[in-house]
UniProtKB/Swiss-Prot annotation:
Span list, region Disordered: 316-403
Stated name of the protein: Uncharacterized protein R651
Lineage: Viruses, Varidnaviria, Bamfordvirae, Nucleocytoviricota, Megaviricetes
Family in the record: Belongs to the mimivirus R69 family.
Positions with biased composition (Low complexity): 338-353
Pfam families noted in UniProt: DUF5769
Polar residues bias (residue ranges): 371-398
Length: 493
């Protein structure tokens, strides 16, 4: 009885021969290419370009149904849609939060005579008809109709409303990674030719972007669109973020750095896209940033104090004081004698990895900047992974060092291999920065209001002006300044 029921259940299961599945796959591929040819034909005619993840997937051989198209104006985007509606069915699929972006779902209209005339003249469809007998033409057309019904694409329209827009100067919205900066007006079937691409961001190079795509690695661009692998560590100081006036400092000073606020709308979008790409097998080759509010910050970073204890990174915030005040954090004359003595005694005991040692010991902006130029990453004071390690183990004599160029692929491999990203800062560096932020807090509490409690002083001041004050010495605690009469005219005046 049980066997009879089992036979009755399996009796009506349709059997599809493997050859039929293979034929359906071939037909589906040809229908897809036919619709893509029509879309890119209109892209070429209307002088618009495709960019973003579709170009990236096209270069590595993946199929994507989502195409980003960049337009010069909203009028051009509307006109392009009208041209597609002659052949295809175009409907609004959803709107983004940005006012200049919308998504269209595109499907073939097989009953449309213009579309049927196009597919009958398409090279992919013509190859199919050449391989079958004339008596099987109606059968093939019926199969194509079923496959065209399953074919659909999603076009993301991005357009610029400014009248000063040009293709070569404007950096598009949501172009957060270097691998999304390539723009084309045709499909790439063979080995890519750099001349076929236009780079949207002039700070990126076509060859470097193609190389990163082939290696499935990407760089998160800075706020101004620069493909920097490492953010400048000298511009970053530490401080608590518990009070409202610290938010005033953070909002004002964050805009002067390369960092992107991870709590902003753009920062959340970047982190979300970064996670999606890493799940797909891509590798971010940016070095971790010690700025806790930056999108490149990693929770595993620790800060080394004077007693060689590691403080949790969640208890500290990194605030950027910009290039105007960078000397205050790097000039040894601003450090106390006690801090300098501690640094000399602790420098020999601290052991770091070669790459992390270089990150923290890059003394100025020129040495700390790592950017992609001619497929290389310029790293000073390094020869190789072994030689750099030996160099920092014997760091007593700093007069002997070499400079070499490590490829971006090496950095990417290092990011893959190194599971630990602990990068302790200098002990005296951290001590200076913490005391400086406490001093700023004290002075700002005394002079935050100017007569009227509703008016906040927004005058800029320098960390040097605070730290060079006669009243501020190592013998005074930061909170003792409440009891002393401090003139802040040279700060806010």
């Amino acid at each position: 009885m049980e066997s009879g029921e089992h036979d009755s259940e399996t009796m009506y299961e349709p059997y599809i021969p493997p050859i039929i599945n293979k034929v359906n796959t071939i037909l589906r591929s040809h229908c897809r290419q036919c619709v893509l040819d029509l879309i890119f034909k209109k892209i070429k005619e209307e002088n618009v370009h495709c960019y973003g993840d579709y170009v990236r997937y096209m270069l590595i051989g993946y199929d994507s149904n989502r195409i980003r198209v960049r337009f010069k104006s909203e009028f051009q985007a509307t006109f392009f849609r009208k041209q597609l509606e002659i052949y295809l069915s175009v409907k609004n699929y959803g709107d983004y939060e940005d006012s200049n972006c919308s998504t269209m779902r595109v499907r073939p209209k097989y009953s449309n005579k213009y579309f049927r005339n196009f597919i009958l003249s398409n090279e992919y469809i013509m190859k199919l008809f050449e391989q079958i007998h004339q008596s099987r033409t109606s059968y093939l057309l019926n199969k194509l109709r079923k496959q065209f019904k399953k074919t659909r694409f999603y076009l993301e329209f991005y357009y610029e409303t400014s009248l000063n827009y040009t293709n070569y100067e404007y950096i598009p919205v949501n172009c957060d990674f270097d691998v999304d900066t390539l723009m084309v007006d045709k499909q790439i079937y063979e080995k890519p030719n750099p001349e076929d691409f236009i780079v949207i961001n002039p700070k990126c190079k076509v060859e470097n972007v193609i190389n990163n795509i082939n290696n499935m690695q990407f760089i998160i661009l800075t706020k101004n669109g620069s493909p920097l692998i490492q953010h400048y560590s000298e511009d970053i100081v530490t401080g608590n973020y518990d009070d409202d006036y610290y938010k005033f400092y953070l909002d004002e000073l964050m805009g002067r750095s390369h960092c992107i606020d991870r709590y902003s709308a753009s920062g959340k979008r970047i982190l979300s896209r970064k996670e999606i790409m890493e799940d797909e097998g891509w590798v971010c080759i940016n070095l971790p940033c010690p700025n806790q509010n930056c999108v490149l910050f990693e929770n595993t970073i620790g800060i080394c104090c004077d007693n060689d204890e590691t403080v949790s990174s969640n208890s500290l915030n990194m605030v950027n004081f910009g290039p105007d005040d960078k000397n205050s954090a790097t000039n040894p004359t601003h450090l106390s004698k006690e801090s300098q003595n501690n640094s000399e005694s602790n420098s020999e005991s601290i052991t770091e990895s070669p790459l992390n040692s270089f990150i923290q010991r890059s003394g100025n902006r020129e040495d700390s900047e790592i950017s992609q130029d001619n497929d290389t990453v310029q790293i000073d004071k390094s020869t190789s992974s072994d030689s750099v390690h030996n160099y920092f183990d014997n760091s007593v004599d700093n007069s002997v060092h070499d400079s070499v160029h490590d490829s971006v692929d090496t950095i990417g491999q290092t990011r893959r291999d190194n599971a630990s990203t602990n990068r302790p800062l200098y002990s005296e560096y951290d001590n200076f920065l913490r005391t400086t932020m406490d001093t700023i807090k004290t002075v700002y509490q005394k002079k935050i209001f100017d007569g009227d409690s509703d008016k906040i002083k927004h005058s800029r001041f320098s960390v040097n002006q605070i730290y060079d004050r006669v009243e501020y010495t190592d013998n005074h605690d930061c909170h003792d300044h409440h009891d002393s009469e401090i003139s802040t005219n040279n700060i806010f005046g």
